[in-house]
């Protein structure tokens, strides 16, 4: 069994807090096809309660996390008619099934940043 897994952490940089109750969907990309694996919610710390892709399921390949930023921002009180961001897709490759991959998202109403964390 592979030893790696995939996690995330979402921070609301405009409010200076974790982005709680934000929906995240994980897809595996196979050529032109996109296969839904699961959808999870962030907890009060802006993390998921378990890995988005656990050890038993991780495999080398291309994946996409889709962060439901628009829904989250509307719940936070931002005007739905003036929102700049909606779904935020982050596509990345996993090249070693024995590594821990961490994909943080720093989110604000008008921009976001991501990187490979540790």
How should these model regions be labeled?
Residues 23-27, 64-66:
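Beta-strand signatures of extracellular beta-sandwich domains
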Residues 50-61:
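Short Pro-Gly-centered beta-turn/loop motif in secreted/extracellular proteins
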């Amino acid at each position: 069994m592979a030893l790696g897994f995939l996690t995330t952490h979402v921070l609301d940089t405009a409010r200076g807090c974790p982005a709680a109750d934000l929906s995240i969907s994980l897809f595996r990309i196979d050529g032109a096809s996109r296969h839904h694996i699961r959808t999870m919610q962030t907890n009060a710390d802006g993390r998921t309660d378990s890995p988005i892709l656990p050890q038993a399921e991780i495999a080398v390949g291309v994946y996409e996390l889709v962060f439901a930023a628009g829904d989250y921002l509307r719940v936070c009180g931002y005007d739905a008619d003036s929102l700049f961001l909606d779904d935020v897709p982050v596509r990345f490759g996993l090249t070693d099934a024995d590594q821990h991959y961490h994909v943080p998202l720093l989110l604000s109403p008008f921009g976001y940043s991501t990187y490979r964390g540790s």
